Amino acid sequence: MAWALLLLTLLTQDTGSWAQSALTQPASVSGSPGQSITISCTGTSSDVGSYNLVSWYQQHPGKAPKLMIYEGSKRPSGVSNRFSGSKSGNTASLTISGLQAEDEADYYCCSYA
């Protein structure tokens, strides 16, 4: 029986100094090894829709969050090109292609507001 990865997406935040709104992600996303999955992050025209400043973080249990994507689609040095970011309107997305066991983690998005 094929096993599935469970990619939890439980926490989102806006990072502006006066931000009150929250971004919306699915509670969980799952996929099988080798598949591609996309995690959405929906905001408003005041945050995600207005700025190309969405960041995505990966966090494994007991570890510090790791920056995976910044400014919507840029990857820091050392981050696999299996991770990609995009945006359409008020929704940003993180796509992970060729899922691997080590991709099982929490993924957080944040946006300037």
Curated annotation (Swiss-Prot):
Compartments, record wording: Secreted; Cell membrane
Region (Complementarity-determining-1): 45-53
Keyword Signal on entry: yes
Residue numbers spanned by region Complementarity-determining-3: 110-113
GO-annotated biological processes: adaptive immune response; immune response
Top-rank lineage group of the source organism: Eukaryota
Main location: secreted
Region Framework-3, residue ranges: 74-109
Signal sequence segment: 1-19
UniProt keywords, alphabetically: Adaptive immunity, Cell membrane, Disulfide bond, Immunity, Immunoglobulin, Immunoglobulin domain, Membrane, Pyrrolidone carboxylic acid, Secreted, Signal
Sequence segments annotated as region (Complementarity-determining-2): 71-73
Positions carrying Pyrrolidone carboxylic acid: 20
Disordered as annotated region, ranges: 73-92
Signal keyword on record: yes
GO cellular component annotations of the record: extracellular region; immunoglobulin complex; plasma membrane
Biological role stated in the UniProt entry: V region of the variable domain of immunoglobulin light chains that participates in the antigen recognition. Immunoglobulins, also known as antibodies, are membrane-bound or secreted glycoproteins produced by B lymphocytes. In the recognition phase of humoral immunity, the membrane-bound immunoglobulins serve as receptors which, upon binding of a specific antigen, trigger the clonal expansion and differentiation of B lymphocytes into immunoglobulins-secreting plasma cells.
Subunit: Immunoglobulins are composed of two identical heavy chains and two identical light chains; disulfide-linked.
Protein name per UniProt: Immunoglobulin lambda variable 2-23
